[in-house]
């Protein structure tokens, strides 16, 4: 369907042999790009995959677009959202600029959108009127490098992107920008601006089709894409799609009651006596957690998860808090504040479990439960965090080598005796590590069913670059620069960073996780909760920075879950993606206001824009998780974003 770009004076709007009027469309997006090198394809796909949406990709440089592309034989529309990588579908070939769609194909697409009431979103557009008029007049063009320009939402844009703060300043970097203005008398409203220039538009065509477009390039690695592309998908689909996007911040602290190695600013590591949490640190951590909730009301439900090793619990301790207490007061103060935190089984003695026997593995899990229960720490039996994620196939073949990077042998390299003991103790979920490829699920927020024991799933955590054995800003800064500074083991930065720069950068990495919708927890260690002065800790410095960045952009809550809830959600997502693979088929009927869902396989699926039993609301988004029987229709009420 490729045709050389020749801009006519007026858009082609000839009547096309297109689909007839129909009220039914599948909840599925069509991404239209020129070819596999089209940057917009990966950008759209990243967001759709994060959400768990159903979609197809059409490469129009080589694949014709026909009525059959868009409409099923029974007259149901195949797609409820059209997602263009760029509004002209232009690409370069042998020195010429071509459009992947010829005039007849454009007209087929427009007729489909018109007849089925389907919206179109373009990830990138310019000024001009070809192939159709987006009501944009040129104010110039510019490239943006690493120094950001700030994007603002108009009142219209704040409605489209209502999960963002209306006052948000969105940093645009590494982009090519068409600066435009709205053509007078044309049916369009600005959604995004930079100064007096329009960089985003919502417009209605002369034949009544609704369109949304940005005038700057994006890719899936940039913050502005994280913030805006979901809103474009949601707008184009009228909020009705498979999957959902919500934002979470979950944090684990490992090794409670245990002793940690201690890294000093001069680079030496103290192993004995090392570092231990005190009663004071515990009281302070509770105070800092309370202060974080007060300072960040969108995270008002935030609560820390603490993974504990019970071998050093003092069984004779009282239960009084000791605000000035030392190591000896840790157990009593923990008992005093036990309900202020959530608790996770991390084994009794913190052994590596790569080669432990069934008996040892069983005792480590079971005895730690007993030790915790004895002082009132309730940890879910279904969840186990093994020491250093051991026992799950990632280990150094030389057990005496503690410094070389471990080797990922895959989950089939797991310790079978650990798995057998865990199963017998009703463990359903084992923490994994996102740094280990074999622990990473195929889909975001899913779990990974263990290939050696299908009753157990692996749910990975995010590691952080706040090192496990640092307790102060000076220690963290020295260690970080010894790794990533210009003279470090893995040089990345041209100069050494300050502590403030490290926290800012690492909080930005975490914001990327949060913006993606990832529910997975971030892991820290006991050294990171030391009160290093004025009540401050490395952990809460990081959390405060992440929450501050989040609240600068988002209006919706920052969610926090206990581990049973988090783990169960990953199983729901695993089932959801299994339904996508099986061919689940939700169809929206605008005449009845219902969505009817069928699947060839039994299972569970998430649907946004649907009000059914157990529906939940997040901002203005409504999601229902549906249980499906094979080949049995289920109908729910649609809640479209109009």
Residue locations for each model-derived region?
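A glycine-centered loop/beta-turn motif at secondary-structure junctions
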Residues: 46-50, 78-79, 116-119, 157-159, ...
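Catalytic grooves of carbohydrate-active enzymes
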Residues: 217-219, 233-262, 373-375, 463-560
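An acidic-aromatic substrate-binding cleft motif
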Residues: 216-310, 339-349
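Metal-dependent polysaccharide deacetylase catalytic core of the NodB/CE4 family, i.e.
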Residues: 25-28, 107-108, 113-116, 123-134, ...
């Amino acid at each position: 369907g490729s045709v050389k770009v020749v801009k006519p004076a007026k858009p082609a709007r000839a009547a096309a042999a297109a689909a007839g009027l129909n009220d039914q469309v599948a909840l599925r997006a069509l991404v239209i790009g020129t070819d596999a090198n089209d940057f917009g394809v990966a950008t759209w796909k990243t967001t759709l995959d994060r959400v768990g949406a159903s979609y197809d990709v059409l490469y129009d440089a080589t694949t014709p677009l026909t009525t059959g592309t868009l409409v099923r034989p029974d007259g149901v529309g195949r797609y409820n959202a059209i997602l263009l990588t760029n509004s002209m579908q232009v690409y370069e070939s042998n020195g010429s600029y071509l459009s992947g769609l010829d005039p007849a194909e454009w007209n087929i697409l427009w007729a489909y959108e018109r007849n089925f009431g389907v919206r179109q979103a373009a990830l990138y557009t310019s000024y001009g009127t070809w192939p159709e008029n987006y009501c944009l007049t040129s104010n110039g063009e510019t490239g943006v490098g690493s120094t950001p320009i700030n994007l603002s939402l108009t009142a219209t844009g704040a409605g489209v992107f209502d999960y963002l703060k209306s006052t948000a300043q969105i940093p645009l970097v590494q982009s090519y920008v068409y600066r435009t203005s709205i053509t007078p008398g044309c049916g369009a409203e600005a959604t995004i601006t930079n100064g007096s220039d329009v960089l985003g538009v919502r417009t209605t065509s002369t034949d009544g089709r609704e369109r949304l477009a940005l005038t700057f390039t994006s890719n899936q690695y940039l913050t502005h894409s994280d913030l805006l592309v979901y809103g474009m998908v949601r707008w184009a689909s009228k909020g009705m799609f498979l999957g959902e996007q919500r934002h979470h911040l979950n944090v684990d602290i490992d090794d409670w009651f245990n002793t940690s190695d201690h890294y000093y600013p001069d680079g030496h590591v103290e192993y004995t006596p090392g570092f231990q949490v005190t009663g004071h640190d515990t009281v302070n951590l509770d105070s800092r957690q309370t202060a974080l909730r007060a300072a960040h009301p969108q995270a008002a439900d935030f609560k820390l998860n603490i993974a504990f090793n019970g071998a050093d619990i003092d069984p004779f301790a009282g239960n009084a808090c000791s605000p000035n207490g030392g190591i000896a007061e840790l157990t009593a103060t923990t008992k005093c504040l036990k309900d202020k935190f959530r608790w996770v089984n991390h084994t009794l003695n913190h052994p590596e479990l790569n080669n432990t026997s069934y008996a040892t593995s069983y005792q480590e899990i079971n005895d730690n439960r007993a030790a915790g229960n004895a002082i009132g720490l309730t940890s879910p039996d279904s969840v186990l965090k093994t020491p250093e994620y051991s026992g799950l196939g990632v280990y150094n073949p030389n057990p005496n080598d503690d410094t070389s990077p471990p080797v990922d042998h895959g989950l089939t390299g797991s310790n079978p005796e650990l798995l057998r003991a865990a199963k017998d103790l009703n463990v359903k979920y084992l923490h994994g590590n996102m740094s280990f490829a074999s622990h990473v699920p195929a889909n975001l927020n899913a779990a990974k069913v263990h290939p050696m024991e299908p009753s157990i799933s692996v749910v990975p955590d995010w590691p952080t670059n706040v090192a496990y054995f640092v307790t102060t800003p000076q220690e963290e800064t020295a260690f970080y620069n010894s790794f990533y500074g210009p003279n470090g083991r893995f040089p990345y930065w041209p100069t050494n960073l300050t502590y403030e720069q490290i926290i800012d950068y690492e909080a930005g990495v975490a914001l990327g996780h949060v913006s993606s919708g990832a529910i997975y927890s971030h892991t820290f260690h006991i050294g990171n909760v030391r009160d290093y002065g004025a009540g401050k800790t490395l952990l809460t410095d990081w959390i405060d920075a992440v929450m501050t960045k989040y609240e600068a952009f988002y209006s919706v809550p920052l969610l926090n879950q206990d581990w049973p809830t988090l783990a169960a959600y990953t199983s729901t997502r695993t089932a959801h993606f299994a339904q996508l693979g099986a061919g689940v088929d939700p169809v929206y009927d605008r005449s009845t206001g219902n969505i009817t869902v069928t699947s060839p396989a039994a299972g569970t699926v998430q649907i946004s824009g649907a009000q059914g039993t157990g529906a939940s609301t997040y901002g203005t988004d409504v999601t229902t998780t549906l249980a499906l029987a094979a080949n049995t229709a289920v109908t729910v009420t649609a809640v479209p974003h109009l």
